Amino acid sequence: MALLPVVVFLITMLLPCVLTNGKDPAFTALITTQSQVQNEIINKHNQLRKSVTPPASNMLKMEWSREAAVNAQKWANRCTLVHSNPDDRKTSTKCGENLYMSSDPSSWSDAIQSWFDESQDFTFGVGPKSHNAVVGHYTQLVWYSSYLVGCGIAYCPNQDSLKYYYVCQYCPAGNNVYTKNTPYKQGIPCASCPGHCENGLCTNSCEYEDLLSNCESLKNTAGCEHQLLVEKCKATCRCEDKIY
């Protein structure tokens, strides 16, 4: 009986890392500087994002971020199964992160699907179905405003079994602590973005983020000309007709 090809752990460990020398075709085919790999990653994310249950009215279509991919690859090269420091995965905004380890070179689609499958342990609007359920990879993957993704992979030969390390970073970051159980707005697909819809996903993304949780009320009271809003509420003030 053949051994299962993939084993995934979400534990803390430090693994020495050596990059592939190019002799392993299965690994080489996963390197994310290749356009076909980037397309696979983007297409898989968008396929899953538009298939959420319940459906989402404000789910943004994802795009590839070269900057996020560079950061993800740098972290993957360290072969450590812990999340990177938030400051190390910033682009123009804060970025979230999903990690995956495999005993064999799984496809990117399989890695991404494994994150999405955490939805089986998640109830929309409520949260994890049990105290020990891990759902943060799923909620980040389907976080409505995370529209940029970049990924990297490393080969870690000194690890006994989990030799393949996958990292994806998402910008702007999802999993807001105050709204983590509602990763998107429930409703008819694209209802929140009339005129900006492609295959059930919104395309009116915002390149900025708010650094305060009460930007909308501050806008109503102080106006976007106030220095505080200029610095801390760029999305609210510059993306009126966009999703953020």
Swiss-Prot record:
Subcellular locations according to the entry: Secreted
GO CC, alphabetical: extracellular region
UniProt tissue specificity: Testis.
Coiled coil regions, renumbered to chain: none
Gene3D superfamilies (alphabetical): CAP (3.40.33.10), Crisp domain (1.10.10.740)
Family annotation (PANTHER family): CYSTEINE-RICH SECRETORY PROTEIN-RELATED
Oligomeric form and interacting partners: Interacts with NSUN4 isoform 3.
Protein name in UniProt: Cysteine-rich secretory protein 2
Biological classification of the source: Eukaryota, Metazoa, Chordata, Craniata, Vertebrata
Name of the gene: CRISP2
